[in-house]
């Protein structure tokens, strides 16, 4: 941060404000404190019969890679509204959300991913401005090596795992970097068991 958005001063530096426990951007001229919080990404796992709707990205990062429709929440909308909007924008698809499915924390990049299971109302879809193409895939046809983000790969794996078990869960976890590798750690209760909610 180079300038204070409150007074325009360039006397902005990181400091621990009084009563706080971590460094924030603080203006040395007017004293304004700037809090930067994680961004929320909301999206859908759209299902049509035994197929999943994927979008090929038309933008960086991961241009040309496959993903589920998802994106940043806008001010003034709910999580579900954001997920439905992103699906409409990226895949021109109409969905009906059925359940909250995954919540992933990515502290390294200050993001929270929230994905919903959703039913395609009808199999009508087309690439939006952020997609090169959209396609329905059965599990064995999914281009696993070309999935854009680990959060999307894990969401898809949880879906097919739950589908085999015959019931769906809410999955909560953290994506952390360990020894140079990004790993997914499930959220655990105090007794060490994984936090899941079945329906």
Predicted segments, located by residue:
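Short connector loops at helix/strand junctions that flank enzyme active sites
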Residues: 22, 39-41, 47, 61-63, ...
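Active-site donor-binding loop signature of nucleotide-sugar glycosyltransferases
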Residues: 29, 57, 70, 118, ...
């Amino acid at each position: 941060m180079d300038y204070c958005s409150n007074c325009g001063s360039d006397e902005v530096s990181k400091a621990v404000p009084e009563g706080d426990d971590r460094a924030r951007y603080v203006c040395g001229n007017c004293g304004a404190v700037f809090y930067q919080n994680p961004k929320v990404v909301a999206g859908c796992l759209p299902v049509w019969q035994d197929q999943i709707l994927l979008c090929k990205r038309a933008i960086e990062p991961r241009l040309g890679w496959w993903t589920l429709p998802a994106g940043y929440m806008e001010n003034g909308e709910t999580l579900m509204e954001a997920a439905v909007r992103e699906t409409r924008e990226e895949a021109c698809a109409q969905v009906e959300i059925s359940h909250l499915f995954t919540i992933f924390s990515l502290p390294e990049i200050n993001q929270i991913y929230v994905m919903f299971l959703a039913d395609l109302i009808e199999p009508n879809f087309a690439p939006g401005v952020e997609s090169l193409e959209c396609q329905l895939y059965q599990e064995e046809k999914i281009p696993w090596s070309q999935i854009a983000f680990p959060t999307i790969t894990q969401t898809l794996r949880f879906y097919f795992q739950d589908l085999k078990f015959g019931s769906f869960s809410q999955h909560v976890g953290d994506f952390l970097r360990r020894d140079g590798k990004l790993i997914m750690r499930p959220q655990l209760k105090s007794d060490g068991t994984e936090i899941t909610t079945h329906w």
